């Protein structure tokens, strides 16, 4: 049948189809399908006069444009964290935003609290993460030569004992460079100390990784930890494994256990290596900072950033890791996101006075306020560093950028003609100590240190 004949035939059957009962409609529909060869549902639509599909109306949008805009603003003010971590603390972030930045309507706040991290990811798709770090490209050169302290320090993987079995106070130590990819001349390094059990991390700048500057940074970091340090696990670098630092550790009433990574096993210090990136490089990027006068600003910046990361930023820890049945990769399981502050309180290792003091310190701080202060300090450091680099390139006087005598910068700052080369005396007790005395105390400390009970299965000293 031609198309015109088919159309006339359908038109003739349509009126009879409309007036027929159910049984007659079935027979008419059978005849039309047999005559035209049409599929049964299509023929039924032609006979009833319904030629178009009626699309089903879907469910309306739960989170509209207004909710998405508020989510973007709160997320940016919180420092653009990963969304599972943002979801874990979204209640506190929305409260801080509502009290410090702008009012949030109750219905929008309720939707933000009910939203899943996957929905947040969908609403924030295409949004660029604004991170404080800057610049790219950095390489670290190695060191050679025999180190007596290194040879006397027990050696094992920092992951020999699971982080879940280690008590708070088992820390890992590492440094990373702010040299901008150029290892020549002098510049700042960052000393990074991370507790394995709670993930409590503190950063502090040090000039050129010298033993005196490193010890000052280590003492400053000890004061930022709310609990005692029981053990220090370092890589094989000489900034920590030296007689000066070892003598200081041995002079303490509760001397921590010092041990190190295995040679050529870069993942033995895995927890602090990960924090070098998530806490350190996220802040500084790969920039070069070599202006000596920036030491004080860098200390204050690192203190603020450490408080922000420890008190307000959740993190996850690996619970189990097993190979897949097909042998392709591993299946990793993590615990629920919690801040290092929450993890520390859950361990119940603090005295009542320490816990009250820590809770009071946390209560008077605001995460968004700290983050804005970090960005402000970072802009100031960039401005001073740019002025210093320009003056150095043009051969101008660099004395305005020289370090103050109170800073123990043992190496000569770039272009300062030996200003403040002498540094300060022993940072531990401000008393002069000969190298021979330091070496004697260091050797005695390393020979007599006792292995903690949770590491007995790793060492037999």
Can you annotate each of these PLM segments?
Residues 1-231, 236-461:
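Secondary-structure boundary/capping micro-motif
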């Amino acid at each position: 049948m031609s198309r015109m004949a088919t159309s006339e035939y359908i038109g003739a059957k349509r009126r009879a189809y409309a007036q027929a009962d159910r049984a007659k409609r079935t027979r008419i529909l059978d005849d039309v399908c047999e005559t035209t060869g049409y599929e049964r549902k299509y023929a039924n639509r032609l006979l009833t006069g319904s030629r178009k599909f009626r699309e089903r109306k879907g469910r309306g949008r739960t989170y509209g444009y207004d909710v998405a805009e508020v989510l973007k603003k709160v997320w940016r003010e919180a420092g653009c964290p990963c969304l599972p971590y943002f979801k874990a603390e979204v209640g506190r972030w929305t409260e801080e935003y509502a009290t410090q930045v702008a009012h949030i309507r109750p219905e929008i706040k309720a939707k933000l609290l009910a939203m899943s991290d996957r929905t947040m990811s969908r609403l924030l798709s295409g949004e660029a993460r604004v991170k404080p770090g800057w610049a790219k490209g950095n390489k670290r050169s190695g060191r050679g030569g025999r180190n007596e302290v290194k040879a006397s320090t027990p050696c094992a993987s920092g992951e020999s004992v699971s982080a879940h079995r280690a008590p708070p106070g088992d820390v890992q130590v590492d440094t990373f460079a702010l040299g901008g990819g150029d290892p020549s001349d002098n510049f700042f390094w960052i000393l990074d100390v991370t507790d394995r059990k709670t993930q409590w991390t503190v950063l502090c700048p040090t000039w050129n990784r010298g033993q005196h500057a490193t010890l000052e940074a280590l003492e400053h970091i000890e004061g930022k930890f709310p609990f005692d340090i029981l053990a220090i696990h370092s890589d094989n670098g000489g900034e920590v494994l030296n007689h000066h630092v070892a003598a200081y550790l041995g002079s303490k009433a509760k001397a921590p256990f010092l041990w190190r990574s295995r040679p050529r096993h870069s993942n033995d210090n895995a927890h602090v290596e990960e924090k070098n990136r998530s806490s350190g490089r996220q802040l500084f990027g790969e920039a070069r900072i070599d202006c000596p006068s920036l030491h004080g600003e860098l200390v204050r910046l690192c203190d603020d950033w450490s408080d922000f990361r420890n008190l307000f930023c959740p993190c996850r820890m690996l619970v189990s890791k097993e190979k897949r049945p097909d042998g392709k990769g591993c299946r990793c399981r993590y615990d629920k996101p919690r801040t290092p502050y929450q993890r520390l309180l859950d361990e119940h290792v603090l005295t009542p006075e320490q816990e009250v003091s820590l809770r009071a310190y946390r209560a008077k701080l605001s995460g968004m306020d700290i983050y804005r202060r970090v960005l402000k300090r970072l802009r100031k450091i960039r401005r001073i560093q740019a002025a210093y680099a320009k003056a150095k390139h043009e051969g101008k006087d660099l004395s305005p950028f020289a370090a103050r005598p109170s800073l123990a910068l043992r190496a000569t700052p770039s272009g300062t003609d030996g200003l403040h080369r002498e540094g300060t005396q022993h940072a531990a007790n401000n008393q002069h100590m000969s190298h021979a005395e330091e070496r004697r105390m260091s050797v005695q400390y390393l020979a007599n240190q006792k292995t903690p009970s949770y590491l007995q299965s790793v060492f037999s000293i």
